[in-house]
């Protein structure tokens, strides 16, 4: 009985078989029609646009920040200059020094001793609160007028006092203040009711004893003097 002889393949046949297996195991790739390159180019352009917009926005924000810092620096420099100038003006020599911040100050405006004629006549002044004259609408008079009025009043007051000195300040009969005073021919003053009662007793004047005949007239002068006092 004879055995079957197995013939081994050559190296070339083995290499071919491995190549066929590799081709069979790989998937079939689609053919490139050129659209892939166009899409990639479009995506790249969009990315470039976004990058440019971002850089422009970032550059604009940086410029705005620089401008803001420049303005803040300018304002700060102005405040420093004003503070230095204010301190220089407030600095005085001698015993009087600038007032501390925790102290309360009161400002008194010393007006020129004249009255604003426009405000006195019309109630309006174009200078407003900066006017150096006093805004007042009270009745005023010049110095010479005041002195004249004072002299007149003083003279009249002296005359009244002199006349009152000559007249008793109370009724001679009732020892009280005059009520409806009357005067006799001998220039003696009494209350009307007191004089009428005395005339029932005697017609002679109670002070000097002269005959009055029971007649007396109203003392208008004394009444005016009593009203002034």
UniProtKB/Swiss-Prot annotation:
Function field: Involved in pre-mRNA splicing.
InterPro entries in alphabetical order: CWC24-like, Znf_CCCH, Znf_CCCH_sf, Znf_RING, Znf_RING/FYVE/PHD
GO aspect biological process, one term: mRNA processing
Alphabetical list of SMART domains matching this protein: RING, ZnF_C3H1
Mapped zinc finger ranges (C3H1-type): 110-138
A GO MF term: DNA binding
Cysteine-cysteine disulfides: none
Gene name tied to this protein: CWC24
Annotated signal sequence range: none
Listed name of the protein: Pre-mRNA-splicing factor CWC24
Gene Ontology CC annotations of this record: U2-type spliceosomal complex
């Amino acid at each position: 009985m004879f055995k079957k002889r197995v013939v081994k393949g050559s190296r070339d046949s083995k290499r071919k078989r491995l190549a066929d297996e590799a081709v069979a195991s790989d998937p079939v790739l689609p053919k490139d029609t050129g659209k892939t390159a166009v899409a990639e180019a479009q995506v790249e352009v969009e990315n470039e646009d976004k990058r440019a917009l971002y850089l422009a926005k970032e550059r604009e924000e940086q410029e705005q920040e620089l401008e803001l810092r420049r303005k803040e620096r300018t304002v700060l420099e102005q405040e420093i200059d004003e503070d230095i100038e204010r301190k220089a003006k407030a600095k005085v020599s001698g015993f009087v020094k600038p007032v501390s911040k925790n102290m309360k100050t009161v400002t008194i405006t010393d007006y020129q001793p004249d009255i604003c004629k426009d405000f006195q006549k019309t109630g309006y002044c174009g200078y407003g609160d900066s006017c150096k004259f006093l805004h007042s609408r009270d009745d005023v008079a010049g110095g010479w007028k005041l002195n004249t009025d004072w002299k007149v009043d003083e003279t009249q007051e002296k005359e009244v006092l002199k006349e009152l000195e000559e007249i008793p300040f109370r009724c001679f009969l009732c020892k009280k203040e005059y009520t409806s005073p009357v005067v006799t021919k001998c220039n003696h003053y009494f209350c009307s009711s007191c004089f009428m009662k005395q005339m029932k007793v005697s017609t002679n004047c109670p002070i000097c004893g002269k005959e009055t005949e029971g007649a007396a007239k109203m003392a208008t002068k004394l009444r005016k003097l009593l009203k002034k006092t």
